[in-house]
């Protein structure tokens, strides 16, 4: 009961902190927001490597087929948080911003032989930014026009999944999730001349819908100590609702008179969408001491319809359009080294991790490709308890992320991730003689 209460408390904290934004990036003003990494504490040390990974004492929710490998006597509970420092650079100007976030809370256990179950809560997207641009109109009256951009929100995911091993070496799995959340984005055009009307554009959406993820893993024995795992994943793309709305408010600060126009959409409710996603990964395992893997992920954003504003500043025509995004390609290479998981030496029991990845730009900004993403991470899995009924791991990793485009803002982010995995023996039967 005490463990269930701890997990419930962690979920409550997660729900409360998900109301806050996990990003400061101005790029979160596009699409559904900044896409969350969604990986656990141990994945992050390998820069999110996951599709071919399975472990008896870790929750790998990025491939639900991995749940079938969960130990039969334990309940696994994993929570994580992160802190980040981001440097923004554009046109010779620099700015730093800090952020901290409660990232996820997930759990898993063995339900039946070769059948594992997992559930948890984690972010899907984040929206959080606030910046402004001022321009001198050179109209002879020293009038300055200021555009202020701000946004908050994000979409969150709660899921329940299962992984089953029907044949030796072959596992299949599925996560059924529920997406909820939304965003509020505002663009304010104001002027130093108090007689000029200010113009406010407000974009809102409220999402409530399902999400489906499928996974498969097949492990082939290469020798007594070596094995190779192939992992596949698929996420269903579909409409998720949201009823995105654009409102335009024109207001005179002197008179206080305001005119509000809601978006015209021919009487039909607009629908946000998520893309079909595909992934393939390989993991080579040498005697559980050295693991090396590679993942490739494709998200078909180019086929997703998204609402866009058309017309002049005084109109509010908001309609669905295709080709707003590019397909998103991501390739990740990672490794984990553990000299001796059962060794008496503390240093040998530590898991040493590293990973790098490249992500192609999927955003289109003014008909130009958005930023490319390069990232690298290092991490450690540190055993902090090693009793018979408790084998917990502290997962710590540092990650550098570079978002760069020749035309737009460059972001350099250093992120510190901390995850704590509790691995408790719940289902063992004690025999007294």
What is each stretch, according to the model?
Residues 2-10:
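Sec-dependent signal peptide recognition
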Residues 9, 70, 127:
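Active-site-proximal flexible loops/turns
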Residues 9, 57, 268-269:
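Residue-level detector of alpha-helical transmembrane segments in integral membrane proteins
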Residues 14-16:
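N-terminal signal peptide c-region/cleavage motif recognized by signal peptidases
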Residues 18-122:
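N-terminal, post-signal peptide beta-strand-biased segments of exported outer-membrane/organellar beta-barrel
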Residues 20-38, 43-44, 114-433:
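Outer-membrane beta-barrel porins/channels
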